[in-house]
Amino acid sequence: MKRRRFWSVLILFSLIGQVAWVVENMYFNVFIYHMFNASPREISLMVEASAVAATLTTIFVGALSDRLGKRKAFIAFGYILWGVSILAFAFLRADWIGAAFPAVANAAALGCTLVIIFDCIMTFFGSTANDACFNAWLTDSTDDSNRGKAEGVNAMMPLLAILVVFGGTMWADTSNASHWTILFLIIGGVVLLCGILGLVLIEEPKGLLKQAAGCYNAQVRKKRR
């Protein structure tokens, strides 16, 4: 039973996490361009800011997870907040922003700014849940007898996620704001549901102990190397 639960958690969280990353990596630049007429400079700024957010989050939250000796809470609640942050993109539309902020002269410019900020927030939760803690949970939950198999399954998920996303979004018109709203509601809802399931399905790895107070800075320095 525990073995089946482990593989179920691995496949579910790895696949859903990679689906969310594919949407972020492949579609956000298209979204900000079509919906808010973003310039190449603004698109580059969004990519750079989210990359910095992902790197710093993985380093510092990963070390914090080691320090506290906790994986489940970071993963489950991280996926829940990750889903909520994706859902927020469903409400980023030029017409809605213009109606909500009538005093703003350029709703598209405000929209670009909000997309960049929300992307960093989404990346923070995604990197917390998936990059920093889920991958650590996978290592903690395996040993020499099954780690290679588990890592192999985890490694193939980015490719499978690309097929899922591109195959599942063939209906979408990237110039239609309503289609973006539907897409973000679906992806955000699935990630949110995944996090809720994690509260029940994920088990803390055996032998994972809370570390001494001085270990946090040492872990951060180690991860930076």
Role assignments for model-derived ranges:
Residues 77-109:
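C-terminal ends and interior cores of transmembrane alpha-helices
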Residues 1-4, 206-225:
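Juxtamembrane intracellular "pre-TM" segments in multi-pass secondary transporters
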Residues 94-97, 199-213:
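Helix-loop junctions on the cytosolic side of multi-pass membrane transporters
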Residues 43-65, 84-85:
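Central cavity-lining transmembrane alpha-helices of secondary-active solute carriers
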Residues 181-200:
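Symmetry-related core transmembrane helices of the 12-TM Major Facilitator Superfamily/SLC fold
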